[in-house]
């Protein structure tokens, strides 16, 4: 039997947002030979019974928990998620001794502080597709893992943080997108999520994306992006949100993705939304977006 890794989505915010990172991470772990389970707590009102139920039937070598956001980004409610994360990790400690590894965009904003608050020892800041399988391999083999890229770990001086490894997204295989129940998220949340690139070179004072995704823009192949759209279309998901920091940067890549959507005949089948920068943005690009099925843009300034 392959060594089993449990991925946990602790995000119970509504309307629900699919944990895209866990779909990508599940593919990477599967390609490395691990058996992967997903415990998605989004659709349960109470998480304790679900954790108890899972561990009454399963044992795992490691647990990876994604923190997508540290709060709900809503001025009216200002719901801070880290205390609830600690409640969940404290509960996990009752039922398993497997290493708990934190990660995700929210975690990457302040990894040492979150690990300290939760009383945990390990996390991955930045991208996890390379580092998480390597870390789990070292844990299973009982080998030293302190040089794993992007690792944040407890040390004698408090916490140590390794530089991350940023992936070559052009050669990234198309994720299977079958770990997460994307169909349910679509039905209850309204759209699916997809990523065409990572990184942002801008230095906006309000934005944390460069902390999690880096400052160098790395683009996926347009074919790979649209292949992934096709995968989700097969399960009935036809509204998408591009999670890129700025979908139109660089403009040539945005254009090529749109042209590939049109070439594949998807533009009449889908509607999509994206974050964009107002500069550079042309009328020509706007027309192409509309032809490719774009239904809305959020401009950040």
Describe the residue ranges of each PLM region.
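Short, solvent-exposed loop/turn segments at secondary-structure boundaries
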Residues: 17-19, 75-79, 216-220, 251-252
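Residue-level recognition of beta-strand->loop/alpha-helix junctions
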Residues: 9, 39-42, 211
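Conserved residues at the C-terminal ends of beta-strands
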Residues: 8, 66, 126, 154, ...
């Amino acid at each position: 039997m392959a060594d089993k890794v449990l991925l946990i989505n602790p995000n119970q915010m509504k309307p629900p947002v699919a944990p895209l990172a866990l779909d990508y991470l599940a593919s990477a772990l599967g390609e490395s030979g691990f058996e992967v389970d997903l415990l998605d707590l989004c659709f349960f009102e109470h998480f304790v019974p679900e954790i108890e139920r899972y561990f009454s039937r399963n044992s795992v070598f490691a647990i990876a928990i994604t923190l997508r956001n540290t709060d709900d980004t809503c001025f009216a409610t200002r719901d801070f998620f880290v205390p609830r994360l600690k409640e969940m990790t404290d509960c996990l400690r009752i039922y398993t001794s497997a290493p708990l590894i934190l990660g995700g965009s929210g975690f990457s904003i302040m990894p040492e502080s979150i690990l300290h608050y939760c009383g945990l020892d390990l996390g991955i800041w930045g991208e996890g597709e390379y580092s998480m399988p390597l870390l789990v391999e070292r844990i299973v083999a009982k080998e030293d893992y302190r040089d794993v890229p992007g690792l944040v770990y407890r040390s004698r001086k408090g916490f140590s943080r390794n530089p991350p490894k940023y992936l070559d997204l052009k050669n990234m295989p198309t994720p299977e997108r079958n770990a997460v129940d994307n169909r349910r998220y679509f039905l209850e949340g309204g759209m699916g999520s997809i990523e065409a690139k990572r990184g942002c070179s801008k230095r906006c004072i309000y934005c944390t994306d460069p902390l999690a995704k880096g400052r160098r823009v790395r683009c996926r192949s347009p074919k790979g992006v649209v292949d992934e759209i096709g995968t989700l279309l097969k399960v009935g998901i036809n509204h998408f949100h591009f999670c890129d920091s700025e979908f139109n940067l660089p403009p040539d890549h945005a254009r090529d993705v749109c042209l590939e959507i049109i070439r594949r005949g998807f533009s009449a089948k889908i509607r999509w939304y994206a974050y964009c920068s107002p500069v550079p943005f042309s009328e020509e690009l706007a027309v192409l977006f509309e032809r490719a099925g774009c239904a809305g843009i959020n401009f950040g300034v």
